[in-house]
Amino acid sequence: VVTNDGSSGLAKTSVLVTGGGSGIGLGVATALAAEGVHVTICGRNEEKLARAAQQITTDNPAGTVDTVTADVTNEDDVIRAVATASERTGQLDGVVTCAGGNETVGPVTQLDVDAWRRTVDLNVTGTMLTIKHSARALVAAGGGSIVTISSIASSNTHRWFGAYGPSKAGVDNLTQLAADELGASNVRVNCIRPGLTRTDLVALITDGGPVLDDYMANTPIARVGEVTDIAALAKFLLGPDSTWITGQIINVDGGQMLRRGPDFTSMFEPMFGADGLRGAVAP
């Protein structure tokens, strides 16, 4: 559905974007605000959220942005974020779960279990809590859309990235579980799997070097993704043109999933050594 003014039909809806203070989350929130969506962004850093909100409204003077300082691994925080996102219009219409990260790097023989648990907690439990409480609001509103953010690392092995790939695979499965359960209430749940996307978090890679070269060699459409690539699909999945689409895991990666994950040897060998990367541990 494209309206007479060329918009996507999302104007005046209310959408919560977790992890909206930076990176893909900020890109999604900016794109939604440009469509006239009432956007609520949440994250753990209040100052970062304030800067993001200022940037979004500067770029989109007609947009409305609320901020909530919230940790998605804290259930009370998630409840508060969902409530805030519902206030402007009296209901919640959509959610994009961009909050995520990784605290584990290195060979499996050297992974720190506490860092592993924190990563799984953020990526899987945080997404679960967001789905749990946003779905309640969406069911009460008569339906809506949830868009989760996974990673190409959930399907293509990213060696030495520890819990990141396995936890994102959990997001994939959780998405389909929720879609199956919530379809009867007209709540759609779909997942976006970004490939290498230009954000501050991965600037060390996207600025150039052997890892980027390997990414490009294994990406049929050989360029780095932009947050606008992810935001465009998120808008579609939130909007009225996707009302019979649910339970889908969609790669936005230039085709990288057709080949293999990147070679991070040049990045991690100086840290762990060649023997360490193959699993050897000094006695």
Language-model segments: which ranges?
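Active-site helix of classical SDR
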Residues: 131, 167, 175
